[in-house]
Amino acid sequence: MEINLLDDEGWLERTWPPERPGYVWRRKRVAGEHLGAGLIELPPGESTFPYHYELGNDELLVVVTGTPTLRTPDGERDLEPGDCVLSPSGPEGAHKVTNRSADPARVLLVSNFALPRATVQPDSDKMMARWGAGRDERRWFFLGDDADYWDGEASG
């Protein structure tokens, strides 16, 4: 399986997320059993994902074209083609990539596929737990929705 980072062939396009009509998500994907990569084309003003960090996965960002802005716990900085940034698992790896330039940007995101894993979005205090690859094998919840270990369990 292979993709070319610079050509205009092989893009998958879909309107995503559904609550953002008009935004067309363009990506190319190459994936194995334990490692995957996605090439994402960011139009001006768009972001890859909300500010987040992974628990159980490291992520590597490679800027292919354009000059996107990277937000991390240390602040924001502009990136340029050829820049590679590792976002390790945990809060210190929190990140968001936004294209604030006037031209499209292409970024390659590479990560391992460890399961189970979790994604935390600290700005909205949300978490996603994932235990499989399907959409029905993950759940989003707000971190304030705590339950005790025995809540809902039968006693005895």
Regions of interest found by a model, annotated:
Residues 1-34, 119-156:
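A short, N-terminal "cap"/entry segment at the start of jelly-roll beta-barrel domains
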Residues 23-25, 38-54, 92:
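Conserved short histidine dyad/triad with adjacent acidic residue
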Residues 39-43, 54-71, 110-114:
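Short, conserved beta-strand element in jelly-roll/cupin
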Residues 48, 58, 65-67, 74, ...:
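A generic structural motif
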Residues 73-91:
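Short acidic-glycine-tyrosine-enriched beta hairpin
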Residues 89-117:
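Ligand-binding loop in jelly-roll beta-barrel domains
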